[in-house]
Each structure stands twice: as structure tokens, then as C-alpha cells.
């Protein structure tokens, strides 16, 4: 996608293969390997280290620093074959929905606007939007906390 001034915006999305939850989406003009490492480190602290990371062959993922760091924390790297998007169909499906439901519908004026609207979309995608592969449930529905009336004499 691009901002109104024609400058490109790159997206980095991290999706849980099992739950289909979008753990993070970052928007930036470019991505360097250190930015990928920062995001993965943040997610590993919050969610734990996964068994593997599956990605395309973008330079930000194939960088020696990223591969070495993942090996050191105990996560395997799985790269899809170039020209074989079906090897990570869940990610391709996600990217298509992301483009159709947000990126192709908006004219973005600033990178900050892209970042804010992307995070809003990600939260709706995870908590509200039904997913056919999950029996039309969202991957991370918001927790429902029932209101419990006070019981006389127990407060």
C-alpha cells in the first residue's frame, strides 16, 4: 500500500498458524532485520517461544541475524519455497482479507494513520470477525464477564 503522497508502506504481520490470531501487524516505510527481531522478542515474551516461524523469503527474515537469533531461542525457521504461496495459505488468506477489508478501501495520508487504522482492524479481526476455518468464530473473542449481583450479607 501507499500513502497519499505515493510513498510505499510495508506491512509485517505475525499470525498464529493454529489459532489464526493475528498477533501483530506493523506498518513502516521499510523493515530491517532488527525491527523483525524487536517484534518477535516482544511476542515471545508475551506468548512464549513457538516451535517454529514460517515465513516467505524476504530479506528481513532470511537475514543471518534473524536466523541466528531464532536458533538461539529455540525456534526453527521454515521458509516457504519461492513462488509457492499455497505453503502458507493461512497467511495468504489473511493478507487478502487485510487488503480487501482495509488497505484497498482507504486513502492513507500519513504512516501514523496507516498504523492506527491497521491496529483497529487487527483487533476487530481477532475479536469480532467470524472465521470460516474456525467454525465462524473469531480467533480471540473478547472475554465476556457477567455482572454478578451482590448477594445480601456476603459483602
Predicted regions, residues:
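Short, basic/aromatic recognition patches
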Residues: 1-7
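Hydrophobic "anchor" residues
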Residues: 21-22
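RNase H-like two-metal-ion nuclease catalytic core shared by retroviral integrases
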Residues: 53-69, 77-99, 110-119, 139-144
